[in-house]
């Protein structure tokens, strides 16, 4: 293969139906406004089913009762999931109280779901409540524009409460990047906010009239923490600081985890290093990467349309050279950086600004009032007295940030009263994560969020049995191969295959810089636990000092590392 130009810059052939849908949508309007008034169905029909995703929503239904409703000759119980745009995950207590009330009053489930893309989702919004939801967000100074479909999604930023000045600078860049890459269409304001329709023609100078070939994800990362999982993202700006001040970014392009079962033309891929840029070129480089992918990405096959496949097709150097040409900027050599972990620092930490920051562990990011643990109410009670801000993390947790010394005891008392602080939560539970999956996700093949808590309890038992109760394995479960749970960057990753069955992947690492290989296909939870027990037993006896589980299974020859995922991800290279 010739790296310089291994494949065509543009894939010719019949465009996918998604491209037709976008081109006929009148800049994302479709007939959504008319569909809103159709009371004969609880859902959106035709192209609108997909177009609403550009407006931050997915049409879902309760899969637990789908068969029952079909027997009764009823349509599925349609409801929307709405995802807020929240670059860097920062939200004020006043905004939080607004979304807390809406979730209680206007959703079927009454919960707020913190996601691993640093925002929140409402699940179960009936069609009649969709417009009020967007209007509420607008009143709070928020929106849901471009949190789904073929656009640049919510921009992540490392949740680093300690280095407060550096975090603030990085966060400001996350916001700027998000705003710069937003769709320019007035469709969102017209449909949801009753903005006046103007006669001017819409233009999309960056995204183009048919937007991007596929979803596009961006992060701003502050080493040594890789909490945002940069290798799951298309475009990454890794902060480079000098004396605590941000001076530029290392740029990495082309990460992504989504695959399709049985299709070896799909694979996860780590992001490639392009080089270093000073701060002043950040937006130019972001735009150039996006427009290159816009023009070169595969619009004939959505399964092969993401940036990672474009890089493999045209070659990293060819793509990089085009970005430099479009931006009028040359990359310098990558500056040194390293990652030491991805987990959140649960509990109190003191920042360099002398303020305190409390990271609350929220299992699977689901804030709801449970018997004896009124989590959602607890966060609302804290919001009523907190003078700083809240930060949603890429690990689905919540940081109460900027707490002065005088308020610390009162906030901790509220957190403990409502079950938001629990000294008995293990390191293993804190380092486990799942996507939503059943009952609301239409793509779910196996349980994830509802499956994980009890599964972790059994893994905790295995660790304790082998004398490793204080240890942890980065464990992730994703309900389908689209990979929202980021299982393909875990030490142990479970990818849903069918109800009660998963593909088991081993050999990622704690830092999130290695993709795990499939060890067993289509097996049950009991089979996974049996394998885990055997391997943890070996890890306990044979590991080196501070050696993580993922590093151990590679060194011990249990499984071979994925070196070049485009070529070796599907190789069966099991050693013992």
Curated annotation (Swiss-Prot):
Pathway: Sulfur metabolism; hydrogen sulfide biosynthesis; hydrogen sulfide from sulfite (NADPH route): step 1/1. Its EC number is 1.8.1.2. GO terms for biological process: cysteine biosynthetic process; hydrogen sulfide biosynthetic process; sulfate assimilation. Binds 1 siroheme per subunit. One of its GO terms (molecular function) is NADP binding. [4Fe-4S] cluster binds at residues 435, 441, 480, 484. Belongs to the nitrite and sulfite reductase 4Fe-4S domain family. This is Sulfite reductase [NADPH] hemoprotein beta-component. It comes from Yersinia pestis (strain Pestoides F).
